[in-house]
Amino acid sequence: MNTRPLIVLVLLLCLSRPVANAQDDDSRRWAIDFRLSPVKPVVTLNETPDKYYDPIKTGGGPNFSAHIEYFIPQTGFSVVGGYDHEVMDFYSGDVSADLSQIMLGGRWYFLSKSCALQPYLGVSTFWNVAGRKDAGTMSMSGMYGSYERKYSVSSPVLSVAPVVGLDIYLFSCVALEVDYGFRMAVDGHTSSQTTYRKDATPYAMRSPMHRHALSVGLKVTFPFKFTNSDVTGLLDSLLTYLYLK
């Protein structure tokens, strides 16, 4: 899929729209956002030798989240909360953890509200309300050999993440949101022992379930206003895009 035209259009929208009255305290009170958030768990031990085609292949997602954000008047701070569904996969999904989380956090926007680009720093907490424990044994046969894997998963009840992000306002009240956080699990761990049919040695894997999380989504601020400047900026961007194309 060629994403270059979409990227060009987004950049044109950001550069063309007037921002003088984009985000003053009268026009931005609260917001909702919807995101997709793939994650990459940290693995602290992997004893599997290179001779086996068995890379860890950790990952997860795209996970889904939805939040409500309240902007504290006359400050650059906000409070945010919502729901995050997160799946962490190990061994391409042979071992996984499914988390349903209540998210609570805060953000600091340190640039002028008149800027179309709004970077922020913050802290997020994730409270897991789903089941925590899972254990079992699975086996697999394939072109790279047969193996048996015993695993144990203890999902964290709480994760804490420093975050850095950027809101890119395409219109007065609509922004593209990009966010990175390192989610540190409290009392979480995943472990496994893998034994190959041709090798009786058990190979261990361990993860504290800390993970990198990159989120991309759409934010809408309220009261919602679609201004004449937004219409003009959209038309100018489309005409410029068509001309460049």
Residue positions per predicted region:
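Membrane-spanning beta-strand positions in outer-membrane beta-barrel proteins
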Residues: 31, 76-78, 116-118, 165, ...
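Predominantly the C-terminal beta-signal and adjacent terminal strand-loop region
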Residues: 171-245
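Flexible, surface-exposed loop regions and adjacent strand-edge segments
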Residues: 48-53, 95-99, 136-144, 193-201
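Gram-negative (and chloroplast) outer-membrane scaffold detector with strong preference
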Residues: 67-145, 156-160, 211-212, 217-224
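Transmembrane beta-barrel strands of outer-membrane/channel proteins
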Residues: 32-40, 81-85, 121-129, 166, ...
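Short glycine/proline- and aromatic-enriched beta-strand/turn motifs that initiate or cap beta-hairpins
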Residues: 22-71, 217-245
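Outer-membrane beta-barrel proteins
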Residues: 41-47, 88-94, 130-136, 187-191, ...
